[in-house]
Amino acid sequence: MNTFIIFITSFISVIILDVIWLGIIIKPFNIKMLAPWMTEDFKLWPAVIVYILLALGTTFFVFPQISSLGTAILYGALLGLIIYGVYDMTNMAIITGWPLKFALVDITWGMVSGGLIAIMAYYISKFLK
């Protein structure tokens, strides 16, 4: 039961963070950096799959490692670094003109969001005990 609650908490946290980050804070930067590749038609289903995958990563790779708030932040940030790093470095390798500046900001965001989601998982797990 705790695993399911951690998954749902992570899933909701990812959505909230991404809506704030992508929809408000970083939107002008993303438009400037990614204009050649952006679509005008937002597709919900791929976003939902991404949020499910990120929540699964937190649930099964970060949550079992959490023994303190510090380890939550460390493992969450590390997962964010790996996921966003693979995405951005793959894009830099295969997409002509993929901006390094965007990649660095995106990877940093992956680490921050991963850490924040892990913090939520940590506090929820403490609440459930």
Question: Where are the language model's segments positioned?
Answer:
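Juxtamembrane/disordered regions of integral membrane proteins
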Residues: 1-129
